[in-house]
A protein has these predicted regions:
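Conserved ABC ATPase signature
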Residues: 53-57, 61
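Catalytic Walker B motif of ABC-type/P-loop ATPase nucleotide-binding domains
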Residues: 78-82
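ABC ATPase nucleotide-binding domains
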Residues: 146, 152-192
Length: 192
């Protein structure tokens, strides 16, 4: 979710709306409220940009603020739609790690939708994979397999497992070609 750069709210204001934004009218700013907002910003790694206009933050920074906004109400379930959309690889990894910590340390169930699942695979407990109007559910090991995903899509899908990581790619498995050494310039001995 990209936030309008003209939105005149700071990151801390957005988090505060998660605390009391469902109530009508302004709420007094108390030391306890400020402390709670600061603690939540710290918990998601957003303290450094707490006073920046939220619309000027990067996609990963905005995502942290929005997660803090959702968490400050102490939910049992965190429901996210495409939390990695528009994020670079590093920011996506940081958000995945943040979600893992939220689930394990704060005991909040995390349910999300995502088109790109590769970064999420190492931390998912269960998966419901929906494709072409059908679904498969179970553990990552049960669902994220070439045969299961190929059947769902009606198209070859390859699931690669390398060094404990899983990568899903479209198309049948192809053995990597062994590249011939590139031609080099003649050696000094050949030139003389």
């Amino acid at each position: 979710v990209l936030i309008d750069p003209d939105l005149p709210l700071r990151a801390r204001d957005v988090v505060g709306l998660g605390l009391d934004g469902y109530r009508f009218g302004l709420r007094p700013t108390t030391a306890a409220r400020r402390r709670r907002i600061d603690d939540m910003l710290e918990a998601v790694g957003a303290s450094a940009f707490a006073d920046a206009r939220v619309g000027n933050l990067s996609g990963g920074e905005q995502q942290r603020v929005l997660i803090a906004h959702a968490l400050i109400g102490e939910p049992e379930l965190l429901l996210l739609d495409e939390p990695l959309a528009n994020l670079d690889i590093a920011s996506g990894h940081e958000i995945v790690e943040l979600l893992r910590r939220i689930a394990t340390e704060q005991h909040v169930a995390v349910l999300l939708s995502a088109h790109g699942m590769n970064p999420l695979l190492p931390v998912m407990g269960r998966v419901v994979y929906v494709a072409a109007g059908r679904a498969a559910s179970g553990t990552v090991e049960e669902v994220v397999r070439s045969d299961v995903l190929g059947e769902l899509y009606g198209h070859p899908v390859t699931v690669l497992r390398v060094e404990g990581r899983v990568l899903v790619v479209a198309g049948p498995h192809v053995e990597p070609e062994i590249l011939a050494p590139s031609p080099t310039s003649p050696s000094e001995a050949e030139r003389t």
